[in-house]
């Protein structure tokens, strides 16, 4: 993101677009998991790249992340990041399996389930943004990575670093209704 100021009004518009996108993504995920979910109102902010890892627990925190590029009239990427415990719970719900306390790694099926969840969420999100803004956007197949947050962020930061030193963050929190 280029070094430019976003006005309060622009942030409000982005928050509303994020809210609608997150709502549609929540509906899609609820149907997929046959579970009631809700979403908190998204927090929209512009962060320097070195601040993003701290937002998700610090550079040494192990996370699961699904990355998707989108192209069209504008281009960019989305990153769906989960703490390891959240990722374990989501994969377990989708695959109807439980993980022991000694859990240390995801197998191929676990990663596939998380990648599919991320794909559905981000496709719903990007589709909503496309509809609301009348921008033609298409989404590429997702990639998944389970690693330390600093490592997970290295690819997006290296790509985005060519055009700026900040990223627009729409932080959506999905919560179980139970």
Residue map of PLM features:
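Composition-driven recognition of glycine/serine/threonine/acidic- and proline-rich low-complexity segments
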Residues: 2-178
